[in-house]
Each structure stands twice: as C-alpha cells, then as structure tokens.
A protein has these predicted regions:
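Serine-dependent carboxylesterase/thioesterase catalytic core
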Residues: 1-11, 15, 21-32, 37-130, ...
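Short glycine-rich catalytic loops that host catalytic nucleophiles or stabilize transition states
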Residues: 30-32, 158-164
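Catalytic histidine-centered segment of alpha/beta-hydrolase-like enzymes
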Residues: 39, 164-172
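Post-His helix in hydrolase/transferase enzymes
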Residues: 43, 170-182
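C-terminal alpha-helix
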Residues: 49, 53, 177-185
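Conserved strand-to-loop "acid loop" that flanks and positions the catalytic carboxylate
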Residues: 133-141, 161-163
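Conserved alpha/beta-hydrolase "acid-adjacent" motif
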Residues: 141-147
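Active-site regions of enzymes building and remodeling cell-envelope glycoconjugates
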Residues: 148-161
Length: 185
C-alpha cells in the first residue's frame, strides 16, 4: 500500500504505484482522498484497510509512505505489526522537531492543532517492530534531511537519494530505490 503525503491524493503517487506494479507488486492506494492531516479516525480506517488486505492475501502488507503518509505507515506498523511486513518512508519527518519542515504552519492552519501535539496517541520517532527503511534526500526542500533520516535507533536502514520532496513519487531513481528497499532490507 502506498500512502500519500500531506495535501496529496492517490493521484500524486500514480507513477510510484505504477512502477511497483510493473515490478510485480500487488499495489493499493490509500483510498481516502486528500491527506489533510493526522486524525485517529483516518488512522483507524487505514489500519482496517491494511488488515483486510493482509487477511485477503494471507500475508502481511508492505507499507510505503510519502511524507505524512510515512508517519501513518509507521504508526500502523506499531499498532498492528502482524499485518505489516515492512515500512518504507519517503521524506517522512519522523525524527526530531516536527517543525523542521517548511509546511508545519500550513498543517497547523488547516488542522487547527499544533504540529507537535497531534490528536493521535503516538511516538513518531519510535521505530516500528517490523523492518523499517527511511529514504531521505538532502535536496528534499520541504522536510529537513535529519528529520527524514532519523537517528540510528529510529530505522533499520536509511538510504540517501538525490531528489526533491515530490520527486520521491515519480523520479525513476527514487522508484528504483523503493523497489530495492522492499526487496532487500
């Protein structure tokens, strides 16, 4: 399953999902329209969808989350590790100060709560109990590289790319890195 970032939809991850499908993966979008921000209801619905896919396929699901979508992926893996095989985050701000990105103010304006006081019970930097790979870029432009890379204990592996924040979803090298992370880490 590929989970889009803040203010993004499944349409924005089309190239990434197509690349994964071409590589033989059974790919699902998140199916919740525009990702407007963190909410317990949205996270619970996503967790139910992941459980349904895992039950139908009789195996855990691999989650790929771009930006805010990666935070959802990490939290679902913590809540339901039996349903998640691994997590790959793409420029997701899971480590350090939540204001270390360029759109925190927009998130707060749209959602009406501080970016460092999310309305869900979570510890963003805690590593999920499944293999967790963080893809990050010094050239991201939106999320600080340290926030998306994390500290050594916050991910099992980190992979540096050279792409913009939105480039994680369509640049061929980024798509290839996601496929590699799903296969080998």
């Amino acid at each position: 399953m590929v989970i889009p970032g803040f203010l993004a939809t499944d349409h924005s991850t089309f190239a990434l999902r197509s690349g994964l499908a071409t590589s033989g993966y059974d790919v699902h979008g998140w199916g919740q329209g525009t990702n407007l921000g963190a909410s317990e209801a949205r996270l619970e619905r996503l967790a139910r969808d992941v459980a349904l896919i895992a039950d139908r396929r009789e195996q855990p699901v691999m989650l790929v989350g771009w930006s805010l979508g990666g935070l959802y992926a990490r939290e679902i893996a913590k809540r339901a590790p039996d349903h998640v095989a691994r997590v790959v985050t793409l420029g997701s701000p899971f480590s350090g100060n939540p204001r270390s990105n360029r759109v925190w103010w927009l998130y707060e304006w749209i959602n009406g709560h501080p970016v460092d006081a999310l309305p869900i019970d979570c510890d963003l930097s805690a590593k999920p109990p499944v293999p967790t790979i963080a893809l990050w870029s010094r050239d991201d432009g939106i999320v600080a590289s340290a926030s998306a890379r994390g500290l050594p204990h916050e991910a099992d592996a980190t992979v540096e790319l050279s792409c913009s924040h939105i480039g994680f979803t369509f640049e061929p090298a980024a798509i290839a890195a996601v496929i590699e992370a799903l296969r080998t880490h």
